[in-house]
Amino acid sequence: YQCGQGG
């Protein structure tokens, strides 16, 4: 899962 702020 990648949060969208640098992973």
Swiss-Prot record:
Taxonomic superkingdom: Eukaryota
Gene Ontology biological process terms, A to Z: defense response to fungus; killing of cells of another organism
The entry's keywords: Antimicrobial, Fungicide
Stated role: Has antifungal activity against B.cinerea. Inhibits HIV-1 reverse transcriptase.
More about this protein: Inhibits HIV-1 reverse transcriptase with an IC(50) of 10 uM.
UniProt protein name: Ascalin
